[in-house]
């Protein structure tokens, strides 16, 4: 493709090659971004054009297929996308639970919130679908956290994050209340997100903690101490902060090596700049967790991802 005077609009250019000759295909399509993959499970790749909203174009996903007889690309199906997206942040193709390829699109609003849309071709109805986008309802994936869809468990399937604040009282400083990131896979048959696991991120210090499966929603919460560089886990009971369960803290490496304020802590991991350690493990709470499980649940964050 090639750009136009509008940075959000590109014109598509396609060519076919046969018997040593290159021929230009008839294409009358513009786009903001595109991806090629087999979206309708017919063994042949299609071209998925994504368009941001402009005064000239609606926000759409448009699936083009090649006609050898007519020597052109034509639109097989299209679907509306969120017109409030100002730029695409991350686009990837992944296999859904039924093995079908779906397009996962992370985009940004003008306020930099991120939202995920899932574009897939319904083979039974021969229509393109975008089930997470509802014109009058908020997309459940909308998040201020700088987190994009990614494969969190190395199964070659991209997972979708839903971010919420953990429980707190009405008078608490919400900046000290940690997020919970719920990771989900997508089921095209029912168009639902299937919950896989939860993680608690410490964005400032670059790590996360995977919530034990035995911890039920609404029974725990986490507080962040930016000055201490600590993340403390608590019981949560009937809108009240309960007993402390344990704490994870990030130390500067030189601070850790000389034992400054770190005697009570057990090392989880250290790199060239930071030592991560835990302390205050309370074995008398309903959420008690072993030291080995704390170490296993710890993981470093990468850019934009857990």
Question: Where do the PLM segments sit?
Answer:
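Short coil/turn segments at the loop-to-beta-strand junctions that recur within blades
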Residues: 28-34, 79-87, 135-144
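Surface-exposed amphipathic alpha-helical segments
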Residues: 278-306
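Structural motif
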Residues: 7-14, 55-65, 110-120, 167-187
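Secretory pathway targeting signatures of secreted, lumenal, and periplasmic proteins
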Residues: 212-267
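Short loop/turn segments that connect beta-strands within beta-propeller blades
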Residues: 17-20, 67-70, 122-124
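Acidic/hydrophobic-patterned starts of short beta strands in beta-sheet-rich repeat architectures
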Residues: 1-3, 41-50, 96-107, 152-164
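Beta-propeller fold detector
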Residues: 23-29, 74-80, 128-134, 194-198
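Beta-propeller blade termini
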Residues: 31-39, 50, 87-96, 144-154
